[in-house]
Amino acid sequence: MFLLYMNPILIAATVVPAVFLLIRVYRADRLEPEPSGLLLSLILRGVFATVIAMMLEELGSALLGSVYAENSLPYNIIMYFVIVAFSEEGAKYILLRRRTWRSDAFNCQFDGVVYAVFVSLGFALWENLGYVAMYGLSTALVRAVTAVPGHACFGVFMGVYYGRAKRYDNDGDFVNAKRCRTMAVLMPALLHGAYDFIATMEDPNCEWVFLVFVLALFAVSLKLVRVGSRSDRYIDGGEGPLFFG
């Protein structure tokens, strides 16, 4: 309902970055475009994932606060690397898998990247609307170049492993399929935790650490998308590269 009270400029500043990234990833899917209904449902599942994550984070925060002082080092490490990271990335992954794992449309390895990024950007879009409604245009502009593409990057890493898991599963290699499904949650959660932990450190020198981390995250994610798009193969199409491993 807060959308009814937001300035159209604020809404545009919030929505446009996510839409831009959605289009870029969609166009990178060179073999076979994904059904629009499926992609829309993934965006909506990303929105729903924010609700699940918020409830888990509230519970986790209350429990953690009863053990450690708020903003102490142990508190922040557990909060960002465990509670926030796994609540958000875990919720995204569960909803992603329930919708796509057995879908007939999931027939190319790069589809995993497309699906995971769409869920992640649905999450980022709704989360961003909430922040911008509270804090205004300056927050929208900052998050447009940090948090929104950050969620997209987490989605790229999730999708790379998710697509590989599907390929291994199709080949009957269930051990590696399970390993990749685990990594599809673990890797983005670790990156997400590092992002939040560095971003909230009060040392002024950490601003440079955060900048380097974000630029490296963006660069590697872009490389993964480009290589994955170029080397994409149909999952049941015989031998082909499992890009990046």
Model-identified regions with their sequence ranges:
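Hydrophobic alpha-helical segments at protein termini of multi-pass membrane proteins
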Residues: 1-245
